[in-house]
Amino acid sequence: GYIEIPVTLIKEKNIKSNMYLSLLSKTLGIPSLQKKDIQKVTTSINDEKKVDFDNNWSCGVSNALLIFINKKIWQEQYESKDQDLGLFKFSSLEKIKANNNWTASLPKKENINIAPLKNGDKIKVNGNTIKVSEIFRNYGIKNVLKEVWPVVSIGDEVYWVPGIRKSDSLIDYEKSGKSNIITASIEKS
């Protein structure tokens, strides 16, 4: 459900970019990209907007990468409670060497929910409650990637945005020394 390609490889209209677009269409399950599909890709690159294709794939630009995401596949993975969510892999650990935004010590007996961003999701950071969408914007996570990036909540409270930010509640809990360590990583293949 995730494909990325550097924008520079397909921005120029030449034989190489056509080859990459052809490879891309096969990977997306589109027999061949039609003119309208190529225009959608061009619009996404030039206007930095999200565009949708007919087969559940969407694309957008983030950090000079053209990113294609199949939200249906991601949603199925979220619903199956799988440990792999798109390009994110979650695992439990007994100990860690370094504590950073890719690890979190979460309360063991709580119902931990990992899901994509929902409208109105907020996180408490440095005593202030701010929208998670604002956190994404500040870290350059936009378009299609923002729609599938995991958000970890306990009840209605957002505790952790993996790789980006921990809430004040999570930071306080981690200071207690209790451990139910979950680590997140990005694994591209």
PLM feature spans:
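AMP-forming adenylation/ATP pyrophosphatase catalytic core
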Residues: 1-189
